[in-house]
Amino acid sequence: MVAPGSFLACRSLEQIKVDVAYSGANVKLIGISSGISYGPLGMSHHSAQDVACVASLPGIEVYVPSDAQQTRRVIRCICQSTAPAYIKVGRSAVEDIYTPQDELSGMTPHGAPPTGVLLVACGEVTQGAVQALRRLQEAGYSAALLDAVSLKPFDQDTLL
């Protein structure tokens, strides 16, 4: 099911909880234009809490891909699974960070393990985090970025 994230995740939460999460139904939900990307349409279209709402439900996987390539890989991955899943995708077109050959990982590292700054990002904001990483490294800081595409299950081993 594809729908604006503000309506899919929040207004339909009770149905998702009962009909998808509790029953373990093989349902894939895609929340488009989530967050505040519908800005001019007002607060009724904002959905900053959609990931938190869906992630609070048992048995549902939650993904927030950073670009079109990663979105394609996430969709292929969840279609091979019978677990319920929610994907949050942004509204804006962003430059690809990944290539079609890159493998999907719950948390993708960029840069060497840092002794200084560690950035963690997901979704559309990863583009800005990549730029921040470059600036930090150019300024001589030891910095790295983890792109957390999988929020549930969360890859805490890579983070730690």
Describe each PLM feature range.
Residues 48-51, 126, 130:
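Short, surface-exposed alpha-helical segments at coil->helix boundaries
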Residues 11-15, 130-131, 157:
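Generic recognition of short, well-ordered alpha-helical segments
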Residues 160:
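N-terminal small/polar loop signature for handling phosphorylated ligands or for N-terminal nucleophile
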Residues 1-118, 143:
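Conserved thiamine diphosphate
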Residues 128-146:
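Short helix-loop-beta junction
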Residues 96-106, 118-129, 148-157:
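A general structural motif
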